[in-house]
Amino acid sequence: MRGSVRLSFVTLLAGIGLAGAASAADLATKAPAYRAPPVMLTNWSGLFIGVEGGGGWGRDSLFFPGPLTATGGFDTSGAVAGGVIGYNWQTPGSSWVFGLEGNFDWADIKGTTICPNPTFNCGTKIDQIHTATGRIGYAWDKVMVYGKGGYAWSNERAEVVVPGTGAINDATGWTGRDGYTLGAGLEYMFVPNWSAKIEYDYYHFDGKTRAANTPAGVFIENITMNSRDVNVVKAGLNYHFNWSPSPVLAKY
Protein backbone atom coordinates (compact mmCIF):
# COMPACT_ATOMS: atom_id res chain seq x y z
CA MET A 1 0.00 0.00 0.00
CA ARG A 2 2.77 2.38 0.98
CA GLY A 3 4.59 1.51 -2.25
CA SER A 4 1.53 2.45 -4.28
CA VAL A 5 1.21 5.82 -2.48
CA ARG A 6 4.88 6.59 -3.04
CA LEU A 7 4.61 5.67 -6.69
CA SER A 8 1.55 7.89 -7.15
CA PHE A 9 3.30 10.80 -5.39
CA VAL A 10 6.40 10.45 -7.59
CA THR A 11 4.21 10.26 -10.67
CA LEU A 12 2.39 13.45 -9.60
CA LEU A 13 5.66 15.35 -9.07
CA ALA A 14 6.96 14.21 -12.45
CA GLY A 15 3.78 15.40 -14.12
CA ILE A 16 3.98 18.79 -12.44
CA GLY A 17 7.63 19.12 -13.49
CA LEU A 18 6.90 18.25 -17.09
CA ALA A 19 3.99 20.68 -17.21
CA GLY A 20 6.18 23.48 -15.79
CA ALA A 21 8.93 22.77 -18.28
CA ALA A 22 6.47 22.80 -21.15
CA SER A 23 4.96 26.07 -19.92
CA ALA A 24 8.41 27.64 -19.62
CA ALA A 25 9.25 26.48 -23.14
CA ASP A 26 6.06 28.05 -24.44
CA LEU A 27 6.89 31.34 -22.72
CA ALA A 28 10.40 31.28 -24.17
CA THR A 29 9.19 30.76 -27.72
CA LYS A 30 6.39 33.32 -27.45
CA ALA A 31 8.52 36.17 -26.01
CA PRO A 32 8.71 39.02 -28.60
CA ALA A 33 12.10 39.71 -30.16
CA TYR A 34 13.60 43.12 -29.31
CA ARG A 35 13.52 45.64 -32.09
CA ALA A 36 15.36 48.95 -32.03
CA PRO A 37 13.08 51.99 -32.33
CA PRO A 38 12.77 53.31 -35.90
CA VAL A 39 15.01 56.22 -36.84
CA MET A 40 13.26 58.87 -38.92
CA LEU A 41 15.28 60.35 -41.79
CA THR A 42 15.31 63.97 -42.96
CA ASN A 43 12.57 64.97 -45.37
CA TRP A 44 13.83 67.46 -47.98
CA SER A 45 10.40 68.19 -49.45
CA GLY A 46 8.97 71.70 -49.33
CA LEU A 47 9.54 75.37 -50.10
CA PHE A 48 12.88 76.97 -49.24
CA ILE A 49 14.47 80.43 -49.40
CA GLY A 50 18.05 81.45 -48.78
CA VAL A 51 21.03 83.71 -49.25
CA GLU A 52 24.29 82.98 -51.06
CA GLY A 53 27.60 84.57 -51.92
CA GLY A 54 30.95 83.79 -53.48
CA GLY A 55 33.24 84.66 -56.35
CA GLY A 56 33.33 84.30 -60.12
CA TRP A 57 35.94 84.28 -62.86
CA GLY A 58 36.19 83.76 -66.61
CA ARG A 59 37.46 85.07 -69.95
CA ASP A 60 35.94 87.69 -72.24
CA SER A 61 36.73 89.51 -75.50
CA LEU A 62 35.32 92.33 -77.61
CA PHE A 63 34.97 92.88 -81.36
CA PHE A 64 34.59 96.20 -83.16
CA PRO A 65 32.74 95.47 -86.45
CA GLY A 66 33.25 99.00 -87.85
CA PRO A 67 37.04 98.93 -88.10
CA LEU A 68 37.02 95.09 -88.03
CA THR A 69 39.33 94.92 -85.05
CA ALA A 70 39.15 92.90 -81.87
CA THR A 71 40.68 92.71 -78.45
CA GLY A 72 42.49 89.64 -77.28
CA GLY A 73 40.91 87.52 -74.58
CA PHE A 74 41.17 88.97 -71.10
CA ASP A 75 40.48 87.73 -67.58
CA THR A 76 37.47 88.81 -65.57
CA SER A 77 36.73 88.19 -61.90
CA GLY A 78 34.73 89.50 -58.96
CA ALA A 79 32.18 88.84 -56.25
CA VAL A 80 28.60 87.58 -56.38
CA ALA A 81 25.89 87.71 -53.69
CA GLY A 82 22.15 87.34 -53.66
CA GLY A 83 19.13 85.24 -52.83
CA VAL A 84 17.45 81.99 -53.82
CA ILE A 85 13.94 80.55 -53.73
CA GLY A 86 12.93 77.02 -54.64
CA TYR A 87 10.89 73.91 -53.98
CA ASN A 88 12.03 70.32 -53.35
CA TRP A 89 10.03 67.11 -53.68
CA GLN A 90 11.47 63.92 -52.19
CA THR A 91 9.88 60.82 -53.68
CA PRO A 92 8.12 58.71 -50.98
CA GLY A 93 10.27 55.91 -49.64
CA SER A 94 13.24 57.06 -51.69
CA SER A 95 16.39 59.16 -51.40
CA TRP A 96 15.82 60.96 -54.72
CA VAL A 97 14.97 64.66 -54.50
CA PHE A 98 13.65 66.73 -57.42
CA GLY A 99 13.25 70.48 -57.41
CA LEU A 100 12.99 73.88 -59.06
CA GLU A 101 15.13 76.88 -58.10
CA GLY A 102 15.49 80.57 -58.93
CA ASN A 103 18.68 82.52 -58.15
CA PHE A 104 18.89 86.31 -58.11
CA ASP A 105 22.49 87.48 -57.70
CA TRP A 106 24.21 90.85 -57.72
CA ALA A 107 27.66 90.64 -59.30
CA ASP A 108 30.82 92.67 -59.79
CA ILE A 109 32.63 90.50 -62.34
CA LYS A 110 34.82 92.68 -64.54
CA GLY A 111 38.11 92.92 -66.41
CA THR A 112 40.00 95.14 -68.86
CA THR A 113 42.55 94.90 -71.65
CA ILE A 114 44.20 97.25 -74.17
CA CYS A 115 41.84 98.40 -76.92
CA PRO A 116 42.70 98.15 -80.64
CA ASN A 117 43.39 101.88 -80.18
CA PRO A 118 46.10 101.57 -77.49
CA THR A 119 45.20 104.99 -76.12
CA PHE A 120 42.32 103.35 -74.26
CA ASN A 121 41.53 100.28 -72.19
CA CYS A 122 38.55 98.13 -73.14
CA GLY A 123 36.61 96.08 -70.63
CA THR A 124 33.35 94.46 -69.60
CA LYS A 125 31.40 94.31 -66.37
CA ILE A 126 28.56 92.01 -65.20
CA ASP A 127 26.41 93.44 -62.42
CA GLN A 128 23.60 90.84 -62.27
CA ILE A 129 23.18 87.10 -62.88
CA HIS A 130 19.75 85.45 -62.61
CA THR A 131 18.84 81.81 -63.25
CA ALA A 132 15.83 79.48 -63.41
CA THR A 133 16.88 75.85 -63.07
CA GLY A 134 15.71 72.33 -62.40
CA ARG A 135 17.50 70.23 -59.77
CA ILE A 136 17.95 66.55 -59.06
CA GLY A 137 19.58 65.32 -55.87
CA TYR A 138 20.30 62.20 -53.83
CA ALA A 139 20.06 62.38 -50.04
CA TRP A 140 21.72 60.41 -47.27
CA ASP A 141 19.58 61.60 -44.36
CA LYS A 142 20.87 65.12 -43.63
CA VAL A 143 23.33 65.27 -46.55
CA MET A 144 22.31 65.78 -50.18
CA VAL A 145 24.36 66.04 -53.36
CA TYR A 146 22.67 67.57 -56.40
CA GLY A 147 23.06 68.72 -59.96
CA LYS A 148 21.21 71.57 -61.65
CA GLY A 149 20.76 73.15 -65.06
CA GLY A 150 18.62 75.64 -66.93
CA TYR A 151 18.26 79.21 -68.18
CA ALA A 152 20.66 82.01 -67.22
CA TRP A 153 20.56 85.78 -67.82
CA SER A 154 23.20 88.42 -67.16
CA ASN A 155 23.21 92.22 -67.19
CA GLU A 156 26.45 93.44 -68.74
CA ARG A 157 28.10 96.35 -70.48
CA ALA A 158 31.27 97.02 -72.46
CA GLU A 159 33.41 100.02 -71.57
CA VAL A 160 36.22 102.02 -73.11
CA VAL A 161 38.19 103.56 -70.27
CA VAL A 162 40.77 106.36 -70.24
CA PRO A 163 43.90 104.86 -68.59
CA GLY A 164 45.03 106.47 -65.37
CA THR A 165 41.75 108.31 -64.77
CA GLY A 166 39.15 105.55 -64.83
CA ALA A 167 36.85 107.85 -66.80
CA ILE A 168 34.50 106.04 -69.17
CA ASN A 169 35.01 107.52 -72.63
CA ASP A 170 32.18 105.54 -74.22
CA ALA A 171 30.14 102.49 -73.31
CA THR A 172 27.37 100.30 -74.66
CA GLY A 173 25.07 100.82 -71.71
CA TRP A 174 23.65 97.94 -69.71
CA THR A 175 22.22 95.12 -71.79
CA GLY A 176 20.82 91.67 -71.03
CA ARG A 177 22.48 88.52 -72.35
CA ASP A 178 20.77 85.12 -72.55
CA GLY A 179 22.48 81.83 -71.83
CA TYR A 180 22.41 78.63 -69.82
CA THR A 181 23.91 77.26 -66.63
CA LEU A 182 25.04 73.87 -65.32
CA GLY A 183 26.06 73.27 -61.72
CA ALA A 184 26.50 70.88 -58.82
CA GLY A 185 26.51 71.20 -55.05
CA LEU A 186 26.49 69.66 -51.60
CA GLU A 187 23.87 70.61 -48.98
CA TYR A 188 23.73 69.69 -45.27
CA MET A 189 20.64 70.02 -43.03
CA PHE A 190 22.47 70.82 -39.79
CA VAL A 191 19.26 71.41 -37.77
CA PRO A 192 15.59 71.05 -38.73
CA ASN A 193 14.59 73.81 -41.19
CA TRP A 194 18.16 75.06 -41.76
CA SER A 195 20.72 73.85 -44.31
CA ALA A 196 24.11 75.06 -45.54
CA LYS A 197 25.41 74.51 -49.07
CA ILE A 198 28.47 74.87 -51.27
CA GLU A 199 27.96 75.02 -55.02
CA TYR A 200 29.80 75.38 -58.34
CA ASP A 201 28.02 76.91 -61.36
CA TYR A 202 29.11 77.24 -64.98
CA TYR A 203 27.44 79.91 -67.15
CA HIS A 204 27.56 80.45 -70.91
CA PHE A 205 26.20 83.72 -72.33
CA ASP A 206 25.53 84.47 -76.01
CA GLY A 207 27.27 87.30 -77.86
CA LYS A 208 25.58 90.65 -78.42
CA THR A 209 26.31 93.79 -80.45
CA ARG A 210 25.50 97.20 -79.02
CA ALA A 211 26.12 100.82 -79.99
CA ALA A 212 28.88 102.54 -78.03
CA ASN A 213 28.20 106.16 -77.16
CA THR A 214 29.98 109.01 -75.41
CA PRO A 215 28.69 110.09 -71.98
CA ALA A 216 26.71 112.75 -73.86
CA GLY A 217 25.00 110.07 -75.93
CA VAL A 218 26.90 110.66 -79.17
CA PHE A 219 27.35 107.48 -81.21
CA ILE A 220 30.96 106.33 -81.60
CA GLU A 221 30.85 102.81 -83.03
CA ASN A 222 29.34 99.39 -82.49
CA ILE A 223 30.91 96.95 -80.05
CA THR A 224 30.22 93.21 -80.05
CA MET A 225 30.43 91.47 -76.70
CA ASN A 226 31.48 87.98 -77.78
CA SER A 227 29.95 84.87 -76.24
CA ARG A 228 31.59 84.15 -72.93
CA ASP A 229 31.90 81.64 -70.08
CA VAL A 230 31.73 82.42 -66.37
CA ASN A 231 32.53 80.14 -63.42
CA VAL A 232 31.16 80.80 -59.94
CA VAL A 233 31.77 79.10 -56.59
CA LYS A 234 29.44 80.11 -53.78
CA ALA A 235 28.25 79.12 -50.33
CA GLY A 236 24.75 79.62 -48.98
CA LEU A 237 22.27 79.23 -46.15
CA ASN A 238 18.69 78.02 -46.75
CA TYR A 239 15.56 77.99 -44.60
CA HIS A 240 13.10 75.15 -45.30
CA PHE A 241 9.39 75.60 -44.56
CA ASN A 242 7.18 72.85 -43.08
CA TRP A 243 10.07 70.53 -42.36
CA SER A 244 8.91 67.28 -40.77
CA PRO A 245 10.40 63.80 -40.18
CA SER A 246 10.13 61.53 -43.16
CA PRO A 247 8.25 58.21 -43.13
CA VAL A 248 11.39 56.64 -44.57
CA LEU A 249 12.99 54.40 -41.91
CA ALA A 250 16.64 53.73 -41.36
CA LYS A 251 17.70 50.20 -42.31
CA TYR A 252 19.51 47.87 -39.91
Feature-to-residue mapping (PLM):
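Gram-negative outer-membrane beta-barrel domains
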Residues: 2-252
